A protein has these predicted regions:
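Short beta-strand elements
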Residues: 278-296
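Active-site bordering "gate/hinge" segments
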Residues: 1-275, 296-366
Length: 366
């Protein structure tokens, strides 16, 4: 659907290489009709398939301990998302601490840091993204025993959980781990009294018979993703109509800028991606980018421990989990899948016996 107005997709819609959004396409009745037709198909799927399926699952697993007994990290973080009117977002941003929905805090970007105490990077200090460093420092695996494919203990190479063990950094807000994603958007907006969200959430809770506290679970994360889709499906046309109204008075497709090579600049983007809170932080010096750091949703959720020993949400939700068959730990997969992981940039193929698979030399100047 994005490609209808923005040329190639998936590609950045703001760069010439990937295609530039064309105002005339937005004003073309045929293009608008195509968009609305495809949107109607998506809304029908959400209403008639996605919602009923999750409702059925909620009822079926309402008393399943491995589904419900999972808090993980109960600090929630989301940004404003989907502008549907002047200063009016479909989802409002904010922060909830310790699962307490009686208070939603405003976001202070100065409190965001990343550290690498347990990550394979050199500088362990908690740094603001503007000052972030990403210089690799792979320290290897350690000898030990682990469960093999038959569910038995066997000699293996293991992650050094007392040292560095991940390619993912540890983002923190005011020194605390956060959980991001649809669960954060839904709970924070419910707590803020966002009627667009409250109406749909209350209806689902009534039909499923679940309490609001059930959202802090594997089932809750899965349901929150559906509820977010439901809210978006109900109000997409509000955003679309607001865009059309805006085009009647403003047809600019870009903001011109000029870089003075004698000055230094810094700027950021903070917003929500489908998997949660996303931010990019850039410094410019001597007319070129001197530092660029991205703090992405799965980094928040999949982060390793920090210097205080605090776990990220993936790790925290697995503590105490009972595994029925050690050779097939489906319970672990179920929980992690509920976060919808996107960690391609942090996944490295490793041999559990410690053998090098291949070696690559990278020229950073190319």
């Amino acid at each position: 659907m994005m490609a209808i107005f923005g040329a190639k997709n998936p590609h950045p819609q703001s760069l010439t290489v990937g295609g530039v959004t064309c105002v005339m396409d937005l004003m073309d009745p045929a293009r608008m009709g195509e968009y609305m037709s495809k949107f109607a198909e998506i809304k029908e799927f959400v209403d008639r398939a996605y919602y009923p399926d999750i409702l059925m699952a909620a009822k079926a697993y309402a008393n399943e301990p491995s589904v419900l007994n999972d808090v993980g990290v109960s600090n929630l973080f989301c940004y404003d998302e989907f502008l549907i009117g002047k200063n009016d977002h479909l989802f409002k941003g904010g922060i909830i601490l310790n699962g307490d929905i009686s208070k939603v805090y405003d976001i202070d970007e100065n409190k965001i840091t990343e550290e690498a105490t347990r990550s394979w990077y050199k500088n362990d200090k908690a740094l603001h993204p503007y000052d972030g460093e990403t210089e690799a420092n792979y320290t290897g695996l350690v000898d030990g025993e682990s469960i093999d494919g038959e569910g038995k203990l066997a000699h293996s190479k293991l992650f050094d959980t007392k040292g560095k063990y991940s390619w993912i950094k540890a983002p923190r807000y005011d020194g605390m781990p956060m959980q991001v994603g649809p669960i954060a958007s839904i709970v924070i907006n419910y707590a803020k009294g966002n009627e667009r969200v409250k109406k749909i959430v209350d209806e689902f809770l009534t039909k499923s018979g679940l309490p609001l506290s059930a959202v802090f679970s594997t089932l809750g994360r899965t349901a929150a993703r559906m509820l977010e889709a439901k809210v978006v499906a109900e109000h997409t046309m509000d955003a679309f109509n607001a865009l059309i109204e805006n085009l009647k008075t403003d047809q600019e497709t870009c903001t011109k800028y000029a870089i003075d090579n004698k000055k230094e600049y810094k700027g950021n983007f903070q917003g929500n991606a489908p998997r949660g809170a996303l931010s990019h932080w850039c410094r410019i010096k001597d007319g070129v980018i001197s530092n660029w750091q991205a703090v992405v949703p799965s980094t928040w959720n999949a982060s390793p421990k920090d210097a205080k020993g605090q776990m990220g949400s993936y790790e925290a939700c697995l503590v105490g989990l009972k595994i029925a068959d050690l050779s097939k730990p489906l319970e672990i997969i179920r929980k992690i899948h509920s976060y919808d992981p996107c960690i391609a940039c942090a996944v490295h193929v490793m041999d559990t016996k410690g053998n090098d698979l291949s070696t690559y030399k990278i020229n950073p100047n190319l």
